[in-house]
């Protein structure tokens, strides 16, 4: 019965998506590409195949949600570029031995901005923010396969303008605990605006992702590769002809190799115990997106670390998504059942 519910919800989401995506406009809502999970953020920003009892991972792939997150609460906070602050909360609940649900909210605040008239005269200040609400359902298809769906509602408020959008994520995961191998496929941000800012509808950053994670048998280490933007092969970028000069001519990079690696995110984790992890991620797209600006050796790299202590899980991540802007993310998770013991 629950399997039929999952298929019905997926069909409705796809039907709604095709209708909404027919609207003309530009891509917006790129804040949906920022993961609220410090674990994922520190592994390159994308990972849809990571197996862990962390309800935050459902944001990457609804099929990663399972009964193991029974009554788990997760909080996240990130100081982003400039005065931007991202924060949110997520809660997971077991339905039965094969199904679970979760709900979450994410707030993206962009700080105070200067308001001007058409002649450039300062008239005051205003604030801007995005809020995303989500609900996730997952169900075990078999012993090794699990499917899931996330429905999202987004509202945007920029000065006196507002907009709303709906979207869905569809995911499936295969996991073999004996070989510690996980593989996932996710269709993200299928949907569109239901209320527009002006005369045109903005498109959502829809994405097809494929990922694998493999634990090594002899050492406590696991590797991940995640392919993103599979719905669009060409991802050209601009690069200075001289990396040491900010005024040298720009060149378009659009070779097969550059396109290939701009789709891929690589990550490795050291897990000495079930309670500790140390991770390193590399996102070539993030690094090359900064090619027109000054960048350093660490551009595109990110770090993640986490540990569980007395019923609480703590996760931190460091990354540099933009030139000269190092970001820090903090996650705190706990299980209500453990707190009440």
Tell what function each PLM region has.
Residues 1-26, 268:
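Bacterial Sec-dependent N-terminal signal peptides
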Residues 21-341:
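Subset of outer-membrane beta-barrel
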């Amino acid at each position: 019965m629950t399997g039929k519910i999952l298929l019905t919800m997926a069909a409705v989401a796809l039907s709604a998506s095709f209708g909404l995506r027919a609207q003309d406009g530009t891509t917006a809502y790129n804040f949906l590409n920022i993961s609220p999970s410090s674990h994922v953020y520190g592994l390159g920003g994308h990972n849809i195949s990571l197996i862990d009892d962390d309800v935050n991972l459902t944001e990457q792939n609804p099929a990663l949600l399972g009964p193991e997150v029974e009554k788990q609460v997760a909080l996240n906070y990130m100081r982003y570029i400039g005065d931007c602050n991202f924060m949110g909360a997520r809660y997971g609940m077991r339905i039965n031995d094969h199904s679970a649900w979760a709900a979450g909210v994410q707030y993206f605040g962009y700080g105070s901005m200067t308001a001007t008239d058409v002649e450039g005269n300062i008239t005051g200040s205003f604030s801007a923010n995005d809020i995303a609400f989500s609900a996730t359902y997952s169900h075990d298809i078999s012993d090794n396969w699990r499917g899931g769906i996330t429905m999202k509602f987004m509202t945007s408020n920029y000065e006196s303008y507002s907009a709303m959008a709906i979207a869905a994520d569809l995911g499936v995961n295969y996991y073999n605990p004996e070989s510690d191998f996980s593989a996932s496929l996710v269709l993200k941000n299928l949907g569109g605006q239901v209320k527009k800012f002006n005369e045109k509808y903005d498109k959502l950053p829809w994405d097809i992702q494929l990922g694998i994670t493999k634990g090594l048998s002899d050492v406590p280490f696991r590797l991940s590769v995640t392919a993103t933007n599979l719905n669009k092969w060409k991802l050209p970028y601009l690069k200075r002809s001289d990396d040491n000069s900010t005024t040298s001519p720009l060149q378009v990079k659009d070779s097969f190799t550059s396109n290939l690696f701009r789709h891929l995110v690589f990550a490795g984790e050291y897990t000495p115990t079930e309670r500790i992890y140390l991770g390193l991620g590399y996102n070539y797209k993030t690094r090359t997106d900064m090619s027109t600006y000054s960048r350093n050796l660490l551009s595109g790299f990110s770090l993640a670390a986490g540990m569980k202590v007395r019923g609480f899980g703590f996760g931190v991540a460091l990354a540099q998504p933009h030139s000269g802007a190092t970001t820090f993310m903090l996650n705190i998770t706990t299980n209500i059942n453990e707190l009440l013991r």
